[in-house]
Curated annotation (Swiss-Prot):
NCBIfam families: S6 (TIGR00166). Binds together with bS18 to 16S ribosomal RNA. It comes from the Bacteria. Belongs to the bacterial ribosomal protein bS6 family. The lineage of its organism: Bacteria, Pseudomonadati, Pseudomonadota, Alphaproteobacteria, Rickettsiales. This is Small ribosomal subunit protein bS6. GO terms for cellular component: cytosolic small ribosomal subunit. It comes from Anaplasma phagocytophilum (strain HZ). Gene3D superfamilies: 3.30.70.60.
Length: 109
């Protein structure tokens, strides 16, 4: 199964509890489709350059997923219907990077 890098931005009005619920719901959806969440990162509440759907900030999250292409297509379709997700980007990658991403800071911090 190929790996995917799935970044999404959630609405600024979500509480930390609601954001955790959203992430757990997306993870449960992946598992239901036979996919696997390999890695999850929360990058924080960051400012937008321009407003998106009347939001000036958003919760940035990154998921690394191992899934079949058909399952990933269905996952993207369902995420598109979720009103709490403002934007998302899904890319196929060769492997999941080890350690923390640049957005999280280096491992030496």
């Amino acid at each position: 199964m190929p790996f995917y890098e799935f970044a999404f931005i959630a609405q600024q009005g979500l509480t930390q509890y609601e954001l955790e619920g959203l992430s757990k719901g997306l993870t449960a959806l992946l598992v239901k489709m036979g996919a696997e969440l390999v890695k999850y990162e929360y990058w924080g509440l960051l400012d937008f350059v321009y407003s998106i759907a009347k939001n000036n900030k958003g919760h940035y999250c990154m998921m690394y997923i191992r899934a079949e292409p058909a399952a990933m297509d269905e996952f993207k379709r369902k995420v598109k219907l979720n009103e709490d997700v403002l934007r998302f980007l899904c890319l196929k990658v060769d492997k999941v990077p080890e350690g923390r991403s640049a957005m999280m800071g280096s491992d030496q911090d």
